[in-house]
Amino acid sequence: MRSAQVYRWQIPMDAGVVLRDRRLKTRDGLYVCLRDGEREGWGEISPLPGFSQETWEEAQTALLTWVNDWLQGSEGLPEMPSVAFGASCALAELTGVLPEAADYRAAPLCTGDPDDLVLRLADMPGEKIAKVKVGLYEAVRDGMVVNLLLEAIPDLHLRLDANRAWTPLKAQQFAKYVNPDYRARIAFLEEPCKTRDDSRGFARETGIAIAWDESLREADFTFEAEEGVRAVVIKPTLTGSLDKVREQVAAAHALGLTAVISSSIESSLGLTQLARIAAWLTPGTLPGLDTLHLMQAQQIRPWPGSALPCLKREELERLL
């Protein structure tokens, strides 16, 4: 016997979270809980403002329609990426497809003071990998900060993310301030320039490896082995169903590219599922999931070791 519940939620964010030039004051989303007999599966649907094509309201309408169809026996999935991902996660839990084993390691994310990152990395066991957002300040400053971190911690490897912020000139200004001897320890720089061709040119000219992120969601993108391209960053909330995520990971691995499962600032429930997906599909690759500290609370399922309060389902607004 099938049954379902849908919840709507809103989590206050820390004051300094800025996405695409807009301040994110709250993270808004939905949960779906599917039941079939004794089995249960959860999924999170949380479109990311400025990145997702669909709004929270559109996702809610699509989710409620899909849930009603599922209750009537339908086996299809919604088309909106965030809804398809959340629905497919709930189904994967319900049917036991999504393994319980998780990779709760996370590459620490530096969005502000590099000294904070140095302190966090000092206590980090094993390989030291961190992520730094670049492109928010002057390119020269970004280059100096990256150089400082690589100089201060000799066994550090950095993942950088520019979100297509730079012109070719600005990208070159950044590279100019990174010691050529350190550049090999930049694991990759996500989408440095506004166009793929400019990003490819940057990789050739500087020797700094790049990764595709936004490009994966463009209609003309194809997986290819290219000079200077080392990785793809897969954000499931922006990608779509679990099957589509699996297809992209497989396509990347077939070309020898690193595939990194990455957060779209999901709640703790969504992040714990991403940790399981990473352990399942990209074992041995550190996922990019260090975003929980941007929020003021957890929900339903806590992230191991987090001191943030965790709300229970009874405290959320139920829609169905």
Curated annotation (Swiss-Prot):
The active site is at K133 (proton donor), K235 (proton acceptor). Its cofactor is a divalent metal cation. GO terms for biological process: menaquinone biosynthetic process. Pathway: Quinol/quinone metabolism; 1,4-dihydroxy-2-naphthoate biosynthesis; 1,4-dihydroxy-2-naphthoate from chorismate: step 4/7; Quinol/quinone metabolism; menaquinone biosynthesis. Converts 2-succinyl-6-hydroxy-2,4-cyclohexadiene-1-carboxylate (SHCHC) to 2-succinylbenzoate (OSB). This is o-succinylbenzoate synthase. Keywords: Lyase, Magnesium, Menaquinone biosynthesis, Metal-binding. It comes from the Bacteria. Its EC number is 4.2.1.113.
